[in-house]
């Protein structure tokens, strides 16, 4: 791609993230490969100047996808380079649930839990060891709009929907379906409506980062609408008006 970052109407910086500490031979396509799973990308502006380390600005169509990308890729090991991913300092003032975009070495706990929760909750069991919160969210989006998802060390997960009918549909259509993790592990999962709120779900799975390009960060994530699996993963700037489904 060529040209600068697209600057839309006020508030559009919520869709834009900074990516630093990139390897010197990085290409725009490589940056796309790191981030496309988080949502539709509007623009990638790669700065690769002589004598300085390359960096990039990635702009998503939806600010929620930008936030997911910051959570999921900050500190990610890309071929030996630990990426620095944050909101531009001139952009948004703070992340959801407290804390800002985060600087180098910022503890992840400062972000706090997502603020949006729902009573329309299902419990998922039988997840494979490599199953992440993002894998679970992607799988359950087929039933409707997911506002919260998390996974735990014992192979269970929790998913909350915006609407009751989406929760009901998830139990009816996604129970005993084949689940695939980002690492290719598959398992048949069970999906059941949660009863009275459990006292504690315990700790989320802690996964060590590896050099494999995986979405292993298991922090819970907030609202993200259902998304067609067949939709293009990257939209060039001339097709900026494509609507999300």
Swiss-Prot record:
Keyword annotations of the record: Cytoplasm, mRNA processing, mRNA splicing, Nucleus, Repeat, RNA-binding
Biased composition (Basic residues): 204-245
SUPFAM superfamilies assigned: RNA-binding domain, RBD
RRM domain mapped to chain residues: 15-90, 120-194
GO CC annotations on file: cytoplasm; nuclear speck
GO molecular function per UniProt: mRNA binding
Localization: Cytoplasm; Nucleus speckle
Domain of life: Eukaryota
Region ranges (Disordered): 89-116, 192-245
Chief location of this protein within or outside the cell: cytoplasm
Pfam families recorded: RRM_1 (PF00076)
SMART domains associated with the record: RRM
Stored PROSITE patterns: RRM
Composition-biased stretches (Gly residues): 91-106
Biological process (GO), any one: alternative mRNA splicing, via spliceosome
CDD domains associated with the record: RRM1_SRSF1 (cd12597), RRM2_SRSF1 (cd12767)
UniProt similarity note: Belongs to the splicing factor SR family.
Function of the molecule: May play a role in preventing exon skipping, ensuring the accuracy of splicing and regulating alternative splicing.
PANTHER family the record matches: RNA RECOGNITION MOTIF RRM DOMAIN CONTAINING PROTEIN, SERINE_ARGININE-RICH SPLICING FACTOR 1
Name of the protein in question: Serine/arginine-rich splicing factor 1B
Gene that encodes the chain: srsf1b
